[in-house]
Regions:
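Short coil/turn segments at secondary-structure boundaries
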Residues: 24-26, 66
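Short, hydrophobic-biased segments on the C-terminal half of alpha helices
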Residues: 45-53
Length: 87
C-alpha cells in the first residue's frame, strides 16, 4: 500500500472526531481504523508506526505521553497543510 494512502487514513482518523491540539488519542486507537490486511501483517504494522513517526517529525502530529501510553493529536498550526494534503 502506498505511504500517502496510509498517511491519509492516519490523518482522517484524527479529523473525525476532531483531535486537534490538546484533544488527543492513543496510537493504538489510530491503528484500529486500518483494513485488516494491513494492520494484521507485521510489515503493515511497521509501516504504520514508521509513518506516524514521519508525521510527528514533520510537525503534523503532536505527541504526548499520557497514562503510560504515547498519545497523538493533530497540530493546529499545520491545519492548512494537513487539509491541503487531504484534498
Amino acid at each position: 500500500m502506498e505511504a500517502n494512502i496510509i498517511k491519509r487514513i492516519i490523518l482522517e482518523s484524527l479529523i473525525t472526531p476532531p483531535r486537534w491540539g490538546s484533544k488527543h488519542t492513543e496510537i493504538r486507537n489510530i491503528k484500529k481504523g486500518f483494513p485488516l490486511h494491513i494492520s494484521s501483517s507485521k510489515e503493515g504494522q511497521k509501516l504504520i508506526d514508521k509513518l506516524i513517526k514521519v508525521l510527528i517529525n514533520d510537525g503534523w502530529l503532536l505527541c504526548k505521553k499520557s497514562t503510560g501510553e504515547l498519545h497523538v493529536s493533530l497540530n493546529p498550526h499545520m491545519k492548512k497543510e494537513i487539509m491541503k494534503f487531504l484534498k
